[in-house]
Amino acid sequence: MERPAFRARQLPVLSLAAFVLSVPVLAAPTYPWRDQPVDAASTLAARVAAPKGFQRAPAAGGSFAEWLRGLPLKPDGAPVLLYTGEAKARQDVHVAVVDVDVGNRDLQQCADAVMRLRAEWLYSSGRAREVAFNDTAGKRLRFSASAQQDYAAFRKFMVNVFAFAGTASLERELKVVEPQAIAVGDVFIKGGFPGHAVLVADVVVNAEGQPRFLLLQSYMPAQEVHVLKNPKSEDGSPWYGLDFGPQLVTPEWNFGRTALRRWP
């Protein structure tokens, strides 16, 4: 008996537009203190190139790492300004200035700037309910749920955090992490009165998996957040390596090797 001719099943044809629409699109990082979108050419990742032979470590979409890499920088050569609007006395410690306001009070210093950036990321990611920090006495300061859609209220809350929290309280609420496991968003911190804290703003790795990292800081008195130079670098690179021995030497503070912390 003759078999019927085989006929291929016709499948629906999807247009390119339909395919594109079916792929989820991750929103670009946002920076609520800005009125305008960030120019891609002015971001930290665009302006501070990875050293030769290194590539930026992977970062998930929407992560703190992605957000930090997208931070807007002021034009090349910009000075670090104090909260008073005056130039900081030392202009030899930075390679770039982050385009984020410092306020008009002597509050947004070292740990304050670290907490500000962490909180801004949470707020901009729709996670304002997670914005909370311990004060020096150990009390948990939480952003009011009733004000979570109000950026002005968020900024007012952060001023309160700056007044009652600092390096001593922040160090206690962060988790100890070994330098070999360093990641974007980690913090080198020494709690005290005074103490100091710097934020790991980026991490790159080479083919052998060896990392290098960038650091951000504010300092005393309150001043603009800036990308630190590496005073030990022989070629002027701002990238730090893990071969720093018992102390991590930064331009204005030295940290012990056990000073690295991570957000819980």
Q: Which stretches of residues belong to each language-model region?
A:
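Cationic-aromatic interfacial patches
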Residues: 29-99, 108
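Short coil-to-beta-strand transition motifs
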Residues: 189-197
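Extracellular-facing segments of soluble proteins and assemblies that are Gly/Ser/Thr-biased and enriched
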Residues: 99-180
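Bacterial N-terminal signal peptides
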Residues: 12-24
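Catalytic Cys-His active-site segments of thiol-dependent hydrolases/isopeptidases
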Residues: 190, 201-228
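Low-complexity, Gly/Ser/Thr/Pro-rich intrinsically disordered linker/tail segments
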Residues: 218-264
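Bacterial N-terminal signal peptides that target proteins for export
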Residues: 2-15
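Structural motif
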Residues: 183-187
